[in-house]
Curated annotation (Swiss-Prot):
Pfam families: HAGH_C, Lactamase_B. This is Hydroxyacylglutathione hydrolase. HAMAP family: Glyoxalase_2. CDD domains: hydroxyacylglutathione_hydrolase_MBL-fold. The keyword Metal-binding applies. One of its GO terms (molecular function) is hydroxyacylglutathione hydrolase activity. The lineage of its organism: Bacteria, Pseudomonadati, Pseudomonadota, Gammaproteobacteria, Alteromonadales. The gene is gloB. Gene3D superfamilies: Ribonuclease Z/Hydroxyacylglutathione hydrolase-like. Binds 2 Zn(2+) ions per subunit. Pathway: Secondary metabolite metabolism; methylglyoxal degradation; (R)-lactate from methylglyoxal: step 2/2. Its EC number is 3.1.2.6. InterPro entries: Clx_II_MBL, Glyoxalase_II_hydrolase, HAGH_C, Hydroxyacylglutathione_Hdrlase, Metallo-B-lactamas, RibonucZ/Hydroxyglut_hydro. It catalyses: an S-(2-hydroxyacyl)glutathione + H2O = a 2-hydroxy carboxylate + glutathione + H(+).
């Protein structure tokens, strides 16, 4: 089993460090800031094998150059777009193997937040950057609502116990909006209480799971009548399909 270590960065970013349980080798996901990563690498005497980049936004890649400068390892970088000279470009359904074959991660192209956005996953772990958050999803900056809807819908098809490692601690704010959409959702009400306790104690709310998100995340619930009814009431018009519902939901959240 691999250990996933949470590294906090900036105000609400999460950088993920995946450590091989049988060695000092590790992988880093979305290192927006090098300083907190280097601290852990030095404290635990870790060797970096690879850096995985979900997309090109600076708060996800800003620490790469400093990490490469500070470490002697021959670190491979994986991304959809050529962001650094050392990048190895990945595409849909590519399989990446690490730690002498003990860890495999597949690539899923999930454009919407950005056009180059990818997720890295297996049946147990999902590193989804800014595509899916706990209780929400990313803003659509470069893609279309249709692309984002397809992206989160594909993620929702992963096994329900898949742990969701997104890149930001947005959960509490997302749940305020989710409660606005489904105020009587019992699973959501329970989760709001759990998240409140964790945040009061300074604990992260991530990882979530796919199963939980399907119960509480309105962006994965666009076929639920409660969500449709709320949006139709808000807009004063009928929504005829899940994509229309998702698009209306994302626009509502953008101005919430």
């Amino acid at each position: 089993m691999e250990n996933v270590i949470t590294i906090k960065a900036f105000e609400d970013n999460y950088i993920w460090l995946i450590k091989d349980s049988q060695s000092q080798h590790c992988i880093i996901v979305d290192p927006g800031d090098a300083a907190p990563v280097l601290t852990i690498l030095e404290d635990q005497k870790l060797i970096v094998d690879a850096i995985l980049l979900t997309h090109h936004h600076y708060d996800h890649i800003g620490g790469v150059d400093a990490l490469l400068s500070a470490r002697d390892e021959k670190i491979s970088i994986y991304s959809k777009k050529k962001l650094f000279d050392r990048c190895r470009l990945v595409n849909e359904s590519d399989t990446l193997s690490f730690f002498d074959g003990k860890l495999s991660l597949q690539v899923m192209e999930v454009p919407g937040h950005t056009l180059d956005h990818v997720a890295f996953y297996n049946d147990e772990l999902l590193f989804c950057g800014d595509t899916l958050f706990s209780g929400g999803c990313g803003r659509v900056f470069e893609g279309s609502f249709e692309q984002m809807f397809k992206a989160v819908s594909r993620l929702a098809l992963l096994p329900e116990n898949t742990k969701v490692y997104c890149a930001h601690e947005y959960t509490q704010n997302n749940l305020i909006f989710a409660h606005q959409i489904e105020p009587k959702n019992k699973a959501l009400l329970n989760y709001i209480q759990q998240v409140s306790k964790k945040r009061q104690q300074g604990q992260p709310t991530i990882p979530s799971t796919i199963g939980l998100e399907k119960e509480i995340n309105p962006f994965l619930r666009c076929q639920q009548q409660t969500v449709i009814n709320k949006l139709q009431s808000h807009l004063g018009k009928e929504l005829n399909d899940p994509l229309s519902c998702f698009s209306a939901l994302r626009q509502y959240k953008d101005n919430f």
